[in-house]
């Protein structure tokens, strides 16, 4: 199976397995998605979804958020980890969104990545899932599977993103990155991985073992 056929097979299999892929983080608009994604750094989606209702009950927009102190935000989000850094980031980005963007989350990578505590991955999630702009956020699951499938060399998430964008059609990026995450969690985890449960790798081992790292 050459790389083109492999990519086409992955796309088809993921579409069969996960025709609908909701964003795992609960949110209602670009701002609440931005905050949820920021909180998800080194924290499970499940934990984030437990914390955001508490936070958003007090402040679900930048204007209400800056009425809270950094310390108040920190106490609410403490179960998510990294609360000192995240609370300063949430307060700081809320202030900038008000002062520079009229209270709206900006719609460009440049302006998103200027916000405190917002890196390229967070910006990519917001661009793709809040605004529908093609992006390919790479988290640990996508980084692992791109390497495991022999589609990237695993050298860095930057390289993995470049390879994903080069190999997969742009019109599929926004859905596909979520499908890969869902697949990774269910069939191809980092720990306790069993090839007998890994549908995609199972096909490769009999067909394309030379460029597979399963």
Regions found by a protein language model. Name each.
Residues 2-206:
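Catalytic cores of DNA base-excision repair glycosylases
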Residues 204-214:
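Single conserved hydrophobic/aromatic residue that forms the stacking wall/gate
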